[in-house]
C-alpha cells in the first residue's frame, strides 16, 4: 500500500470513529435574569438556588470560601442546580460597589463577585475609615452623585478598574440614578417577597433556607433533588 493511501485510510478511520461527547460545564453559562440577578448554570435545572448577598458581608465571604466550590463543582457543573445571585445592599460602600459590580456584562459581574470576596477586607478597608475631609466631600455632593464620590474617596473605583471594569464605564454607571434606584428596589422586593432580613439568605425552589452556610444549603439542595 502506498504511503498516501495508508494516510488516507487512517484519516478515514478517524472520521468514522464516534466522537466522544465532552460534558458541558454549566458554570460557564451566565445570564442576567428578569429579577435583576445573575444566573449561573442550566436555566432548566430542576433545583434553583437564589442567593441574596451583600458585597460587604463577612458571612457571604465565608460561604464563598467554603461552599461555592462544592456548589459549582458537584451541582452547577452537572446541570442539576442553578445559582442566581441577587444584590441586597446593606450600606453606602456596598451600594457603590454593587453599582460597579453590575455595570458590565453578566460574565463580568460574576467574575467581580468572586474577586470582591477574595479581596474583601482590602477593598473595603478604606471605606470604613475615611478621614473627615473625605466625609465632608461626600456629604456635600448631590444625592445622585454620592455613590461615585464615595467610590472615589474610598478607592473602590480604582479597585474595580484593576479588576477589569473600564473607568469611563464605571463613572457612567455610578452617575446613573436608575442603576442606584434598581439596587434599592431589589432590596425592597427581597424584603417584601422573601422576607430577607440579612445576608446571605438562600432560597431553594422558592423556599428560604434556615442558616447561612454550606452546611445549611447543601442538605436543602439534596432534599430538592430527591436525595435528602
Q: For each predicted feature, which ranges?
A:
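Extracytoplasmic thiol/disulfide redox context detector
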Residues: 2-95, 187-188, 192-193, 226-228
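C-terminal cap of thioredoxin/glutaredoxin-like
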Residues: 3-5, 21-23, 54, 146-228
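Alpha-helix boundary/interfacial micro-motifs
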Residues: 15-16, 71-73, 78, 96, ...
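A short hydrophobic/aromatic micro-motif that marks alpha-helical segments and, especially, helix-coil
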Residues: 17, 120-123, 181-182
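Functionally engaged cysteine thiol sites
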Residues: 25-27, 103, 173
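Tryptophan-centered motif/residue detector
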Residues: 25-27, 123, 214
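Extracytoplasmic/periplasmic, Sec-exported soluble proteins
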Residues: 41-44, 59-63, 88-92, 101-104, ...
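Structural alpha/beta surface segment adjacent to cysteine/selenocysteine redox centers
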Residues: 55, 62-147, 153
Amino acid at each position: 500500500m502506498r504511503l498516501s493511501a495508508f494516510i488516507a485510510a487512517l484519516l478515514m478511520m478517524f472520521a468514522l470513529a464516534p466522537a466522544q461527547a465532552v460534558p458541558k460545564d454549566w458554570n460557564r453559562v451566565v445570564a442576567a435574569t428578569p429579577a435583576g440577578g445573575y444566573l449561573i448554570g442550566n436555566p432548566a435545572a430542576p433545583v434553583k438556588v437564589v442567593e441574596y448577598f451583600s458585597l460587604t458581608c463577612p458571612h457571604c465571604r465565608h460561604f464563598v470560601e467554603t461552599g461555592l466550590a462544592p456548589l459549582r463543582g458537584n451541582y452547577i457543573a452537572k446541570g442539576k442546580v442553578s445559582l442566581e445571585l441577587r444584590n441586597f445592599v446593606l450600606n453606602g460602600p456596598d451600594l457603590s460597589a454593587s453599582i460597579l459590580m453590575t455595570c458590565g456584562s453578566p460574565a463580568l459581574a460574576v467574575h467581580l463577585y468572586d474577586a470582591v470576596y477574595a479581596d474583601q477586607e482590602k477593598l473595603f478597608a478604606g471605606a470604613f475609615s475615611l478621614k473627615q475631609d473625605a466625609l465632608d466631600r461626600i456629604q456635600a455632593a448631590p444625592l445622585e452623585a454620592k455613590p461615585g464620590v464615595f467610590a472615589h474617596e474610598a478607592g473602590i473605583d480604582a479597585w474595580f478598574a484593576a479588576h477589569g471594569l473600564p473607568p469611563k464605564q464605571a463613572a457612567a454607571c455610578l452617575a446613573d440614578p436608575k442603576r442606584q434606584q434598581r439596587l434599592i428596589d431589589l432590596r425592597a422586593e427581597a424584603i417584601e417577597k422573601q422576607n430577607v432580613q440579612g445576608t446571605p439568605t438562600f432560597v431553594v425552589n422558592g423556599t428560604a433556607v434556615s442558616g447561612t452556610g454550606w452546611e445549611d444549603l447543601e442538605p436543602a439542595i439534596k432534599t430538592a433533588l430527591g436525595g435528602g
